[in-house]
Amino acid sequence: AYYNAILWVITGKQAHADKAMEIIRAYAGTLKKIEGPDDPLCAGLQGAMLVNAAEVMRYTYTADKYAAGWNAEDTQKAESMFRNVFQPVLTTFYKTKPYTNGNWGIAVTKAQMAFGIFMNDRKLYEDAVEFFMKGHDNGTLPNYVAESGQIQESGRDQQHAMLGLGCLSEIAEMAWTQGQDLYSALDNRLMKGYEYLAKSNLGYEVPFFTWKDITGKYSNWTTLGEEGMGRFRALFEIAYNHYVERKGLEMPYTKIVLDMIRPEGPGFTCDNPGFGSLLFYLGKDLNAGQKPGRIDEDLSRHEGWTFTGCSYKSVDNVMSFVSSGVSMQKKRISYQAGSYPYIAVKAPRIPASINKDWLQLSYSVASAPEFWKLDADKAQKVGEDIYVFKVTDALSNNGTRFTERPTNIT
């Protein structure tokens, strides 16, 4: 429902509006209860997505302009669902003795604030703000992000730390639209969390201490969690936009991450909304001076590229650095082969022993990745170091001809 609502606003295609309405009405007309051991997470994460979809449709697809548009009955049924099905789960969580990692409480607060805004319920909203700042739980700003920027779940793994921090920024963004600044709370504590998360996941050393959490159950992590390290989710743009574009502050490590992953893609399941470059970025045109669909990449600079190289292993009982070759790749490059069928690569130092298909392109076909290996021996040589490949003649590993339509490639 949420993504169809966004697509409706962007494209103006009524099919997306009708699908969003169909989904919202189906839930509002049938959902009676949310239960299970993870019900606060379900009500928090999925509830936040659903109420945001309802918020968009309520004010952009109205019954006075569209026959199937949002009407008074939709408001009544949606509010009844949020108040009588979702909200009791959130209220129970707030009243229960703390028992979870912080991302649970943050997800609950994200949904409650969104419900309060949708239903014009000031108490729900203010209670969410109170919990965000002062709640007795791991899921509050001071209890989730330390002064150093370390996150309560940094020692657990990186995906949960990203989930929690992303939800905190969504709370701050909602409050900002209501005229309240939670971003600046505790001397820009949220910004410090982002910089710590970005810096540590980029491989830089950061200070780490064993966290004493509210529950006492999660106080035995003595190092940064390795799981998920360096796998950046789509949740950095929202905070970067506020602190850098709105406030003129600096987030150097977050900028490095965004240079690698822009434009941000979808969120992970329903954890965070994703597509932050589309939804939140308010800076200068990132494509200014570029021709749509034309690749213009500087291979000598690290921005956006990931590398694999040597590893440290035993050779004849001696620990040695061993390399089977160095590879580099960059994801989500916008390319349109129909307009630019040739790719020229300036590569002055290619070893004679390297495989001739050192340039490979890939994108998904029918939800599965396919790969196009371009033969350097068949490339047109310009001078000593420029190879010109014709992409539209290439066939994939499955025999598929490279598309001429705009697509994001690796």
What feature does the model see in each segment?
Residues 287-309:
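Extracellular carbohydrate-recognition regions
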Residues 151-231:
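Active-site/pore-lining binding-face segments in mid-to-C-terminal subdomains
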Residues 1-179, 187:
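Aromatic-lined, polymer-binding surfaces characteristic
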Residues 310-315:
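Transition segment at domain starts
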Residues 317-399:
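Extracellular ligand-binding interfaces
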